[in-house]
Amino acid sequence: MTGPVLPDWAIVGEKRRAHIARVTGLLDRWAATMRLNADEAQAWHDAGRWHDAFRDGTPEVLRPLVGDPDMLDGLLHGPAAAVRLERDGETRRDVLEAVRWHTVGYPRWERTGRALFMADVLEPGRRFMSTDRAFLAAQVPVNFDGVFRQVVRMRLEWTLREGNRIHTETAELWNSVR
């Protein structure tokens, strides 16, 4: 399968690579429809292709990059990828923050982080709420902030339903958009 070019250090299987391609494709379509300038469109594309670059990495590989002994294993991949990208010379704060916080959210995100958060949830390969998610994905170019709020709500409701921990950043993100 071909798709977005990943860093040589990426640890992803074929399913994850397909997800990354769908997320990046959705971000690219939104950027074109919204007529973003070239720099912002590239930031969205890069955030999409890098957000899960370490998703299939083990905690033993990722935790030393992150340096947080208490971070849940499933959350390590975003911060680890951001650290690695920064070491490799990436300087765009909006891209680094988008990648770093894409699993839990971040209240001080610029549009790049918000777009990635939505694309990660709304990409068409996910199997839950297909009709609702497709509708929301189509609305992003005309109601970016409204759809973002709804996606944050969806993620928060899912977190509560599953009995998962609500992270400080997630609560702060909700409070910033409600």
List the predicted regions and their residue ranges.
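Short, low-complexity, intrinsically disordered N-terminal peptides in bacterial proteins
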Residues: M1-D8, W174-R178
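Divalent metal-dependent catalytic cores for phosphoryl transfer on phosphate-bearing substrates
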Residues: L6-E14, A18, D28, M34-R149
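Charged catalytic carboxylate motif
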Residues: R22
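Internal alpha/beta core interface subdomains
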Residues: R149, R153-T159
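Charged phosphate-binding loop/patch that engages nucleotide di/tri-phosphates or the phosphate backbone
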Residues: E157-R178
